[in-house]
Amino acid sequence: MFNANVNDYMNNFFLYDSATGQLELNTPEILLVKEFEALLDAERNKCKQDPKGIYKLRAFREFRYIYLAIHWNSPYADYFAKDRHEEALKDAEMTEEEFEDPLFRAACRKFKEL
């Protein structure tokens, strides 16, 4: 029974706001999982557009990739793994270097486990 609840919980992990084009975390409690919380670290989110890392732009792109490439309800769910990865990278505006980041890969593995 617990597994069913976890699956229901994870199925509702993301919300897509079609008006803004933003992917949002529907269940912020998921950030209690260290692999997901690590993605939001301000230091790793610093970029040209967000020098202080407060807007978590990198984490947003990473969560977008996780949804598009791994989530069972992704629009790319029926694609072959390689094609799904390429489309998710493109749509998430991520580089291969960002994809290979150990913290991000750990979050992907954790999402698959859940």
Q: What residue spans do the PLM features occupy?
A:
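N-terminal, charge-rich alpha-helical recognition modules
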Residues: M1-E113
